Amino acid sequence: MTLHESGEDYLEAILKLREEKGQVRSIDVAGELGVTKPSVSVAMKKLREAGHITMDENGLLSLTDQGEAVAQRIYERHRIIARLLMGLGVDETTAAQEACKIEHHISDGTFAKMKAHLQQIQDGNL
């Protein structure tokens, strides 16, 4: 199943919330993304059926290996793109919003170049 942007956003939100809180419920995801609980329920059903997440009997969400891989890829893109934008003088809030838009559409090759460029900046080679 090909994930749409929203599916990637849900997986990224679960990853971020897990890092912050240790455990994640649908209501946490709704708050993080600013969507309704019914919207989250529909999305979680689709992500479960696609094998990206599991939900235990207490309603706790977990990423499967497949879901973890997607979430990590999107979250890395988000962080790198936001850092590059802030390095260009974009404020943190705008950089985060723009990174969220770009992270879904940028090619792997272009992202690799951006990541390498940021590493050169951090290493003092630029």
Enumerate the language-model features and the residues they cover:
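Basic, amphipathic "hinge/linker" alpha-helix immediately C-terminal to the N-terminal HTH DNA-binding motif
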Residues: G59-R77
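N-terminal helix-turn-helix DNA-binding core of bacterial DNA-binding proteins
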Residues: T2-V35
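Canonical helix-turn-helix DNA-binding module
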Residues: S26-E57
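C-terminal regulatory/oligomerization modules of transcriptional regulators
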Residues: Q97-L126
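DNA-binding alpha-helical recognition surfaces that contact promoter or target DNA
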Residues: E12, V42, Q97
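Arg/Lys-rich, alpha-helical DNA-contact motif
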Residues: Y75-D108
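Residues within the alpha-helical elements of helix-turn-helix
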Residues: E32, V70, G87
